[in-house]
């Protein structure tokens, strides 16, 4: 019998929402509201090893906000971050994540909801998107951790999805071998696609030699990935 999950309190969600809003305003991301109902609201979840205030998360929040013309890109921290504890199993983060998504979605009921996650955050985002009371338009997985610590393929949340899903993966990401991902994608019932960052690792970092050989910068490589995300979101919105 599965252990009973502790119910997330309203005060916990409100506190995280307030913290996120203050960070976003200081970063200049969501201070400008776009009066266009086609502009999505994006809830962006961090990975296991770094909070929403990490350089990578801030950079990608900016990229997503610009490329998707989002009315708001909201990041947050899972509770274990403030407690300085190691991350729990992804399943134990679903309730908090889901409650937070509902809180943000209620602010923008007429705008498409896009769930984005980095690594562990993408896995939890997929679990949240499966819930009946979450009406997401798409899920974007940035470095999906398909391979578990003991090598098991963790595809259960993906096979349950019915929401259009995009994977952005580095082909040197040991946590998500592209061959394994391709096999899972064929079994998924949801519309899905993948964008491969050539020579990118789990965080899409490309080695200096490979960048020189390709005649591209790291920034340009990441912008190409974000442009692909914007194209995907635009296509499913038609």
What are these regions (language model features)?
Residues 160-162, 167-169, 173:
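Short beta-strand/loop motif that positions the catalytic acidic residue
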Residues 43-47, 143, 169:
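The conserved beta1-alpha1 loop
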Residues 174-180:
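Conserved alpha/beta-hydrolase "acid-adjacent" motif
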Residues 77, 142-143, 197-198:
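Alpha/beta-hydrolase-fold catalytic nucleophile elbow
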Residues 16, 20-114, 123, 204-214, ...:
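Serine-hydrolase catalytic machinery in alpha/beta-hydrolase-like enzymes
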Residues 97-163:
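Primarily recognizes the serine-hydrolase "nucleophile elbow" in alpha/beta-hydrolase
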Residues 48, 171-173, 199-201:
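Acidic beta-to-alpha connecting loop that harbors the catalytic carboxylate
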Residues 192-238:
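C-terminal catalytic histidine-bearing segment of alpha/beta-hydrolase fold enzymes
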């Amino acid at each position: 019998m599965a252990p009973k999950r502790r119910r997330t309190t309203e005060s916990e969600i409100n506190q995280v929402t307030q913290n996120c809003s203050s960070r976003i305003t200081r970063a200049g991301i969501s201070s400008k509201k776009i009066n266009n109902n086609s502009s999505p609201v994006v809830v962006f979840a961090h990975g296991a090893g770094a909070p929403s205030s990490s350089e990578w998360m801030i950079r990608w929040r900016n990229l997503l906000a610009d490329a998707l013309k989002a009315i708001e890109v909201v990041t947050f921290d899972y509770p274990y971050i403030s407690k300085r504890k190691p991350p729990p199993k992804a399943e134990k983060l679903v309730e908090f994540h889901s409650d937070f998504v509902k809180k943000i979605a209620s602010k923008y009921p007429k705008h498409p909801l896009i769930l984005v996650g980095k690594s562990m955050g993408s896995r939890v985002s997929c679990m949240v998107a499966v819930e009946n009371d979450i009406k997401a338009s798409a899920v974007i997985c940035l470095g999906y951790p398909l391979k578990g610590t003991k090598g098991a393929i963790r595809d259960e949340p993906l096979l349950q999805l019915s929401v259009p899903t995009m994977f952005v993966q580095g082909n040197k990401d040991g946590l998500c071998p592209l061959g394994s991902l391709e096999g899972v994608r064929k079994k998924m019932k949801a519309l899905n696609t993948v964008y491969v960052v050539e020579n990118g690792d789990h965080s899409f970092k490309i080695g200096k030699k490979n960048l020189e050989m390709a005649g591209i910068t790291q920034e340009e490589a990441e912008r190409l990935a974000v442009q692909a995300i914007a194209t995907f979101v635009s296509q499913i919105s038609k």
